[in-house]
């Protein structure tokens, strides 16, 4: 589907904002935003007990329906007796230096904050085409069929701006 066909799904107010958002998307694709400081998550696997409180806190904070999970705790097991292994992997958006999802968005809804490097989605510009979901190697953008939008971790940006920790971190 071409960008023009995709953009037809937006309302008039959102359509008016698309050219500027696309211009920003194109500029940051070829000249990535270098934030003043880059926020990210560091997960200490030794401290994690696999309780998934971080997942629940994230779903509560973001009002997510069953299905999408911005924070995911997965278990990796393998080997054969007596040489077995098991560990937990805690995944969310990596807020990449050069996010693959950003140039994939036809409306420019995905953007990277200059002050802290958090990659975010403007839900008023998202049309739910799922291109970002297909390009992210980490599975961060996730489609929410209840809104027909793609959503992802934004590090609880409202909490960070208020001087607090993201919900997943506080719940751990």
PLM features per residue range, with description:
Residues 1-171:
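Non-ligating segments of multi-cofactor redox enzymes
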């Amino acid at each position: 589907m071409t960008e023009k066909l995709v953009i037809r799904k937006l309302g008039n107010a959102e359509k008016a904002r698309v050219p500027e958002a696309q211009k920003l998307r194109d500029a940051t694709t070829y000249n990535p935003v270098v934030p003043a400081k880059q926020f990210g998550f560091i997960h200490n696997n030794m401290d994690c007990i696999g309780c998934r409180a971080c997942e629940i806190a994230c779903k509560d904070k973001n009002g997510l329906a069953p299905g999408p999970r911005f924070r995911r705790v997965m278990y990796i097991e393998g080997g054969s007796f007596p040489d077995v292994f098991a560990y937990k992997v805690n995944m969310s958006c990596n807020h990449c230096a050069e996010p693959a999802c950003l140039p994939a968005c036809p409306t420019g809804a995905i953007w990277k904050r200059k002050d802290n490097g958090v990659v975010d989605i403007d839900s008023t510009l998202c049309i739910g085409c799922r291109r970002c979901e297909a390009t992210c190697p980490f599975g961060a953008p996730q489609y929410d069929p209840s809104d027909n939008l793609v959503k992802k971790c934004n590090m609880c940006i409202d909490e960070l701006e208020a001087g607090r920790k993201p919900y997943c971190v506080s719940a751990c």
